[in-house]
């Protein structure tokens, strides 16, 4: 995530800041500028084109720090959410704040990398939308269906998430990870078409395989022997769809961590764009960085980061 500076006093700002603690200026995130900008006393902002922006209406209930275009109540990120927990569901609403924060994070990440985000509408029924649901009173299945991503906001609870992670024997499980994985499914449907489809099949396998049958096989037999040489995770071995989504998610994990390391002066190597392939980025930048970060975690008595 990009490092930000207050435009009034040049103090450091972080992605979710709504106030500069140094000079006291109210702040809001401009998706158009990919930057945190100072607000007027009334909570407004006028950009270089003369367009007017205001604080998102979800600032209170979702902790949103983004700006909405004049005439719109919601910012771009919040407008993608089709369903949220009922306001009487206190637990669900608390968890919903965490889910929305993760969604804002990944949208900026996708914008930075140039991935197209086309919202669902009457004219675009398979566009991107989110159902952020509470499992307090009903079962919620995380997944993707024709552009609609469903997230169980209970995954924001560390104890719940760790219990599920241990049960499924997963090395990594976070709210941000769920968004990245499900967005992998979405972008496969958007980007993997035409000639690219055959290339994807060469890499990930035939996506027309019976999905339920492959799920049953995976949970009854486990991953194939030697899976580590061809897959990013055991979950990726289940079906070509999951292989693509897992690979996409880990691509975002790796890219974000490298970018953060560079932003905060932890790396002095050549930029990722100077490498020919992403494999070269992994070998040249990611492996040395992940080893160092794992050692730092172990020095604090924690498990490895990656």
Model features per residue range: what roles?
Residues 10-14, 27, 60-63, 68, ...:
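Cys/His-rich microdomains that often coordinate metals
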Residues 24-34, 77-86:
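Short Cys/His-rich micro-motifs in 6-15 aa windows
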Residues 158-179:
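Short pre-active-site segment immediately N-terminal to the catalytic Zn-binding motif
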Residues 186-242, 248-257:
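Post-HExxH zinc-binding segment in Zn-dependent metallohydrolases
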Residues 59, 99-158:
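Auxiliary, metal-adjacent structural segments of Zn-dependent hydrolase domains
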Residues 6-9, 20-23, 47, 53-57, ...:
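Short cysteine-rich clusters marking metal-coordination/redox-active sites
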Residues 20, 173-193, 245:
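Active-site recognition of the HExxH zinc-binding catalytic motif
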Residues 11, 236-306:
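Pan-zinc metallopeptidase signature
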């Amino acid at each position: 995530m990009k490092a930000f500076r207050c435009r009034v006093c040049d103090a450091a700002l972080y992605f979710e800041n709504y106030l500069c603690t140094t000079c006291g200026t109210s702040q809001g995130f401009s998706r158009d500028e990919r930057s945190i900008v100072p607000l007027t006393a009334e909570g407004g902002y006028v950009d270089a084109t003369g367009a007017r922006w205001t604080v998102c209406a979800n600032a209170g209930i979702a902790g949103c720090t983004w700006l909405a275009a004049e005439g719109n109540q919601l910012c771009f990120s919040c407008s993608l959410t089709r369903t949220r927990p009922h306001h009487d569901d206190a637990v669900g609403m608390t968890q919903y704040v965490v889910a929305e924060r993760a969604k804002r994070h990944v949208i900026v990440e996708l914008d930075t990398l140039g991935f197209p985000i086309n919202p669902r509408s009457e004219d675009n029924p398979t566009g991107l939308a989110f159902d952020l649901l509470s499992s307090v009173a009903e079962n919620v299945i995380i997944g993707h269906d024709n552009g609609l991503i469903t997230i169980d906001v209970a995954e924001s609870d560390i104890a719940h998430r760790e219990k599920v992670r241990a049960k499924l024997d997963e090395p990594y499980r976070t709210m941000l990870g769920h968004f990245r994985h499900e967005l992998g499914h979405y972008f496969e449907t958007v980007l993997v078409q035409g000639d690219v489809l055959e290339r994807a099949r060469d890499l990930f396998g035939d996506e027309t395989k019976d999905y339920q049958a492959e799920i049953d096989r995976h949970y009854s037999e486990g991953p194939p022997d030697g899976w580590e040489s061809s897959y990013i995770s055991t979950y990726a071995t289940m079906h070509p769809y999951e292989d693509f989504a897992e690979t996409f998610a880990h691509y975002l994990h790796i890219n974000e961590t490298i970018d953060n390391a560079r932003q905060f002066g932890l790396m002095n190597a050549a930029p990722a764009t100077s490498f020919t392939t992403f494999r070269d980025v992994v070998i040249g930048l990611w492996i040395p960085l992940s080893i160092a970060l794992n050692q730092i975690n172990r020095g604090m008595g924690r498990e490895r980061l990656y």
